[in-house]
Amino acid sequence: MKKLLMLTTGGTIASVEGENGLAPGVKADELLSYVSKLDNDYTMETQSLMNIDSTNMQPEYWVEIAEAVKENYDAYDGFVITHGTDTMAYTSAALSYMLQHAKKPIVITGSQIPITFQKTDAKKNITDAIRFACEGVGGVYVVFDGRVIQGTRAIKLRTKSYDAFESINYPYIAFINEDGIEYNKQVTEPENDTFTVDTSLCTDVCLLKLHPGLKPEMFDALKSMYKGIVIESYGSGGVPFEGRDILSKVNELIESGIVVVITTQCLEEGEDMSIYEVGRRVNQDLIIRSRNMNTEAIVPKLMWALGQSSDLPVVKRIMETPIADDVVL
């Protein structure tokens, strides 16, 4: 019999109507009471970690979630984490870096409609998450609307539809329906890799989206505030060097010891800075390339990498090395 633990953090799935709109209010045991027992041979216990709207999610809370999994890892066969949808992709990626080579399923889910509403996707999503947790497939995953997504590859694309999340630049792991679980990709974990937990994070990371007209001077203000900056550039990853010269400011950031990651605003296919002059002018030895990683994975990965070291070559190596299938080289 599988022994599962549900860790709750709040989110839409646990929300109720209040004077100022929807806000988390359903407790862990109550949340589970809305879901009918499955035929799967399992028992489930609950633990409430927090009860927040995921818009208020912070890196320190990622650590709390990871530590809860660590503390209970030996006592349970799998974990279901309920979470708000707005920052779920960031959390799933962060857990993928802090909880590497898990031999047990760590499944994150939530809903677009509160579980207390008559018409809701919450019951199905929790049910699907439990079913997948019973499979015993190790790793961190997002389960939503019948789709199983690698924890580092989930992105929220829709604000209202049930199919809020998609897997970007990576196949779906599986699909869940009434007939069972249909695997779309074989999940393999090297047997010699042991489960490791490292919750060291440096939260001094900024995400900046380029746009025409952006003032280069704003980069000066970032020097004293951050140790790492993720720049969402255009297309294949070029950086403007004419008119409002952003490239010079990027070079100044690097010279001052700040780690800079270049990614693209395009969701699919990733950056390739080797194609255009605007990409080739960037110093490939000093800049960190994101290739086809999702922004929602790049940000927590950079926090985690800077938590391991402040040395640029070390951080660059970590960032450009695949972890939990976050990048395909």
UniProtKB/Swiss-Prot annotation:
It is found in: Cytoplasm. The gene is ansA. Keywords: Cytoplasm, Hydrolase. Its main location: cytoplasm. The active site is at T12 (o-isoaspartyl threonine intermediate). GO terms for cellular component: cytoplasm. This is L-asparaginase 1. It is an enzyme of class 3 (hydrolase). One of its GO terms (molecular function) is asparaginase activity. It comes from Bacillus subtilis (strain 168). The keyword Ligase does not apply. The keyword Cytoplasm applies. Homotetramer. Pfam families: Asparaginase, Asparaginase_C. It catalyses: L-asparagine + H2O = L-aspartate + NH4(+). InterPro entries: AsnA_fam, Asp/glu_Ase-like_sf, Asparaginase/glutaminase-like, Asparaginase/glutaminase_AS1, Asparaginase/glutaminase_AS2, Asparaginase_C, L-asparaginase_C, L-asparaginase_I. Residues 2-322 form the Asparaginase/glutaminase domain. It comes from the Bacteria.
